Amino acid sequence: LILCYLVINMSNILIIKHGSLGDITQASGAIQDISENHKNDQIYLLTTKPYFDLFKKNPFIYEVILDKRLPRYNLIYLYFLMRELKKYNFSKVFDLQNSSRTNFYKSILFPKADKKVWSSSNTTLPLDKNKEEFDKISVLERFDHQLNESGLNTSNTLKPDFGWASTDISEIKNFYKIDKYILLFPFCSPHLTIKKWPHYNKLIDLILNRYGDEYKIITVPGPSEINDAKDINALAILDNGRSLDISQLTSMIKNSSFVIANDTGPAHIAAHVGVKGVTLFGKHTTAYKVSIERDNFKAIQVNDLNNLSAEKVFEKLSSSLS
């Protein structure tokens, strides 16, 4: 009888989170809080192909739904996606993407819904701020405000733990004979070269001069970064000639002695798995706005990354390892 009662009273809850990798990492605490506030409900997550299999590992999600994110004018795709979502009869939606696209989904699925049914930064906007002002607040504080305004108790949103994404990498570590290592992420998207610090090889020289072979110096290039990795004087870690998947990448980061990264997805992973490290920020944004600084993971913020010396970065590393 109790089981029947629970089944009858179980609701379906939808979370929307499309990407990018840094965004996915940051949302881990919010997803955990949503789940813990809905212990008797089933949590579904709508995401994109790069994160579909990854989210199947998340212990706080019951089922993952794929959104191919085809153009909005593809009415046939849109029709079938909306039909798919409607069949779950979701009682509440948490929009953690907060994009124009997900706002468009709301206009189809729940056009008149308030924050009790559709939780987003728009429906939970503070009375004294417009959206532009609200978006200047750090991303984790925005999530926290959104969930609090939606009636949730939040104990994880401000301190996400991405550890759930990790996997066994003993075979990779054995293949490359690595134990203690310093992990570098000198890469960035081709259209975001403003995020790229140019002095990694000089930093590597400083590390080798101080520590010799105490630490291996490695990189973990993504699919489009394998060629670029050849320009860095570090061991590039691959899995049978291919880039590591997100779970393998997470474990490599989590097991490292120290991480040095440009402002990229792997830097956000490092921040939210508790590893020691530093990320390098130019004037493109602030470390505060993207919520990347943690107890062990810090940012160096400068106006021009070209003028940030390898010595300054090495100083952060050596003081942390000593």
List PLM regions with ranges.
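A short, glycine/small-residue-rich beta-strand->loop->alpha-helix junction that serves as a flexible
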Residues: 16-27, 54, 189-198
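Nucleotide-sugar donor-binding patch of glycosyltransferase catalytic domains
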Residues: 120-121, 239, 268-322
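Nucleotide-activated donor-dependent transferases that construct or modify glycoconjugates
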Residues: 10-21, 184
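Conserved nucleotide-diphosphate donor binding/catalytic pocket of glycan-assembly enzymes
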Residues: 65-162, 181-186, 190, 284-287, ...
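Active-site donor-nucleotide binding/catalytic segment of nucleotide-sugar enzymes
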Residues: 161-227
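Conserved nucleotide-sugar phosphate-binding/catalytic loop shared by glycosyltransferases and other
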Residues: 44-74, 234-238
